[in-house]
Amino acid sequence: MTRPSPVLATVARLPASAAVLVAAAALLVTPPAPAQESPQPSRADWLREARLGLFVHVLPASPSDLAKIDDFDVEALAAQVEAAGARYLVLTLGQNSGFFNAPNAAYDRRTGYRPGERCSRRDLPLALHGPLARRGLRLMLYLPCQAPNEDARAQEAFGLARGPRDQPIDARFARLWAEVIGEWSARYGDKVAGWWFDGGYARVRFDEEIAGIYAEAARRGNPAALVTFNPGVMLVRHTRAEDYTAGELNEPFSVVPSSRWVDGAQWHALTFLGSRWGARDTRYPVERWQEWLGKVVAGGGAVTLDVGPNWDEKAGPIGSLAEAQVAQLRALGAEGR
């Protein structure tokens, strides 16, 4: 039961005429409640303070690609993230191909793959954490909301329909997928500051129950970990379970925060610096990015920019970023600070 306020308790003891006067006075002096509130303190406070982060799509699509995870230069990438002025890095664990950047025994047991066959033997998130942490930078992880849609064997093993597209999911599937999520979360503990889950679409029947199952698994190792679930190209609070908005945007410049909060979730946008996701070029002059980032930061938001890691050993260290992108990011990092 809600405890009555002191003003209301006093009114209840007064004659009717006096009660009316007191109640009217209370309306004049009581400030209006904020339009959008969030629990304080919020798990997402550090994200607001970070302002700018980077995202890298590391998506091996074959055994030869997976072998390159052994050569991924984590020191080079961490140094570039720091030089860019970003405060965190989001790394993909995997996506559609069925190849993943870290070992996972739960996944291997469910699918029947041998260790190292689909999940790399090198634990890339663990390898990245050290160089990032020494620089005061945080690590976050990306994972789809369902088994890889280009691996029919995995789809069948998790009880999904086979086919190269996102399949309908339910709570039964979510509990199986949560075993995979939970193994990674338990291993990494507080080394992972948050999760960005892709494919939380209405068309695959993603719902609050599934979001809750995934959020619990993602926080198995770190109760303070942030989670969000991507509903598509939009910036909204999609579920009650999320701490910040997924905020996927293709053309971001017209989208700015009017408040730090979106229905109680931290305002956050994710878009790409290059011409497309994972590209290594630049698509806009740095001044346009500076203007937008300045507005976002002033409004209490945070921005994650996707950049392209190198996969050609002849072009430089595996996993390193293009100098053209790093140059833009240095200017943006200064703006974010």
Kindly give the residue locations of the regions a language model identified.
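N-terminal secretory signal peptides that target proteins for export/translocation
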Residues: M1-A12
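Serine/proline-rich low-complexity intrinsically disordered segments, especially terminal tails, linkers
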Residues: V7, S17-A19, Q40
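Bacterial N-terminal signal peptides
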Residues: P15-T30
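Sec/Tat signal peptide C-region and signal peptidase I cleavage site
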Residues: P31-A35
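Mature catalytic domains of secreted/periplasmic carbohydrate-active enzymes
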Residues: Q36-R337
